[in-house]
Amino acid sequence: VHLSGEEKAAVTGLWGKVDLEKVGGQSLGSLLIVYPWTQRFFDSFGDLSSPSAVMSNPKVKAHGKKVLTSFSDGLNHLDNLKGTFAKLSELHCDKLHVDPENFRLLGNVLVRVLACNFGPEFTPQVQAAFQKVVAGVANALAHKYH
């Protein structure tokens, strides 16, 4: 992903303020609610029967944090996203059989959750920079599918 110096500063500056557990749980929870077919990958998470059950589910929150922790690794290696996410791409492709379109959906949900959490601080410039990053991460995660 090619980001200008300003874009990198915007992304890393905001990301440093992100509560990974809170935003991760909100992002994964929102994905599971808005795109309910994604729930099939999380059979072991227990009750996902309603929006409130999803959003209060501790396994959703924990996995959301895990997802954003990996995303943080990507932010530290923007010039090598494919390498950074190679093992996760392989896992999601070969073992979990996740449709790679779900990575794009989760990226878009993450951008929306960040906007909700940071309000005016999430300027159009910050949003544009994050869109580039989530697109790059989604592409890297889909790499093994090609």
Curated annotation (Swiss-Prot):
Keywords: Acetylation, Heme, Iron, Metal-binding, Oxygen transport, Phosphoprotein, S-nitrosylation, Transport. One of its GO terms (molecular function) is haptoglobin binding. The modification S-nitrosocysteine is found at C93. The modification N6-acetyllysine is found at K59, K82, K144. It holds the Pfam family Globin. Heme b binds at H63, H92. Residues 2-146 form the Globin domain. The modification Phosphoserine is found at S44. CDD domains: Hb-beta-like. The keyword Lipid biosynthesis does not apply. SUPFAM superfamilies: Globin-like. GO terms for cellular component: blood microparticle; haptoglobin-hemoglobin complex; hemoglobin complex. The modification N-acetylvaline is found at V1. GO terms for biological process: hydrogen peroxide catabolic process. Red blood cells. It comes from the Eukaryota. The modification Phosphothreonine is found at T12. InterPro entries: Globin, Globin-like_sf, Globin/Proto, Hemoglobin_b, Hemoglobin_oxygen_transport. The keyword Transport applies. Involved in oxygen transport from the lung to the various peripheral tissues. Heterotetramer of two alpha chains and two beta chains. PANTHER family: HEMOGLOBIN FAMILY MEMBER, HEMOGLOBIN SUBUNIT BETA. Belongs to the globin family. This is Hemoglobin subunit beta. It comes from Tupaia glis. The gene is HBB.
